[in-house]
Every structure is written in C-alpha cells, then in structure tokens.
Amino acid sequence: MLLKDKTAVITGCNRGIGKEILETFSENGATVFACVRNIDEEFKSLLNELTKKFNNQIIPIQFDLNDERKIKEAVNNILALNKPIDILVNNAATIHTAIFQMTSIKKLKEIFEINFFSQTIFTQYILKSMIKNKKGSIVYVSSTSALDGNGGRSAY
C-alpha cells in the first residue's frame, strides 16, 4: 500500500485516465478527494465500488473549472476537513475537435481557460496548504497530442 496515510486530490476522475488514477490511488490506500464537474449515478456507483473493493475513503467534490469562485469554494471544502494534502493530480481537461481555421477564438479561450488557467488557479490554492504543511507533490497529466499532431485537435 504505497499511498497508505496519504491524501490526494484528483481532478477529472470520472472517466479515462483520471478514473484509472482514482482506482490506482484507491488500490494503494490513499484517501482521495475525487473532483468532478458533475456527480451522476455512474460516478456514485464507481465510488461505492472502489471503497468496497479497497476500503479507502473517497470524498466526492463537485465544481466547475470555468468558475473561479467555485474553484476556491471547492478548495475551502477540501481544506475544511483538515487532511493535509500530499498529492495533487491535475487531470481535468476539455477537448474540441475541429480544424484550426474553423475554431473560434471564443472556443480557443474556453479550452485554455479549462485546460490551463483553471488548473493553475486550483494549484495555487492547494499549494498554499502544501507549503504550510511543508510537503506535497503536484502532477499535471498531459497527452501525446502535442507530440503527434492529431488532425482537428490543434486547440487542445
């Protein structure tokens, strides 16, 4: 149990890579704040399944990365539980598939807001707690899209 007695915050953990990270951290004994935009029945079922299987604590945190006020509120809710944050995994992202010349500036700004600025803001708030506790690791999840140049994903 590599992460026993560790507390992690994971964004975007309802599907894909984030879901796998959530499962891996759970399997290794971490207490996890599972951050998602929407807590639906499928996500609740996943959390129940993981906590039964691995006997760890998973606390769902719902907020929209488009809203800085909601980001701050989510961080306050996390910190209110007085669990020092050992690990922050920024995984949440959005993608828009269209050729570059057909992608509006508004859409580009929206993607950058979620994929970069909101994650940076979230990290700044969590980092204050890590500095106070004199410990913590921050992981930013990325994809290979920047390297392989997938057609229609230049905004991503």
Where is each model-derived feature located?
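Substrate-binding pocket helix/loop in short-chain dehydrogenase/reductase
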Residues: 99-100, 107-112
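Residue(s) in the substrate-gating loop at a strand-loop-helix junction
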Residues: 143
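Conserved NAD(P)H cofactor-binding loop of Rossmann-fold oxidoreductase domains
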Residues: 91-96
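A short, exposed helix-loop element centered on a Lys and neighboring polar residues
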Residues: 123-124
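Conserved glycine-rich Rossmann-like NAD(P)H-binding loop of the short-chain dehydrogenase/reductase
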Residues: 28-45
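Conserved glycine-rich cofactor-binding loop
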Residues: 7, 14-15
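Active-site loop-to-helix junction immediately N-terminal to the catalytic Tyr of the SDR YXXXK motif
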Residues: 103, 149-156
